[in-house]
Amino acid sequence: MSVLNTDLAKQLGAETLGARLWRIQPGQASTNHRHRHSAEIYLLLEGTGKLRVDGELVELGPLDSVLVEPGSVRQPFNDTDEDQLWLVVGAPVEPANTLEMDEATLAFIYPDGPKALPPELS
């Protein structure tokens, strides 16, 4: 999986929330993952997109958004022929260093493994 990722929060010095721009190219997906404490807003800026939340498929057009609560499994993906541009904002910030996580935490965050593709791209 290859998602072009810009960390806006880091660039702006934000410490209490995360904000990223994701460009998801055709046939690509973000990781299927969840956060223990962070809620995230997924705003599709360009393209048409799909986001699976707890097994349910949500289809979005430009400027559509979805709020994903903590604990929910989420995965945006691109099964179209055009790039998608997403703005993802979440709080509170959670550690993202998977190298320091134990097996149980990794299994919670990535229930299908960190490289699982959605069925639409498999």
Question: What are the residue ranges of the model-derived segments?
Answer:
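A generic "binding-loop/recognition-motif" signal
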Residues: 37-38, 56, 72-73, 82, ...
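Short beta-strand His + acidic residue motifs that chelate non-heme Fe in jelly-roll/DSBH
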Residues: 32, 51, 68, 74-80
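A short glycine-rich, His/Asp/Glu-containing loop-to-beta-strand
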Residues: 1-32, 38
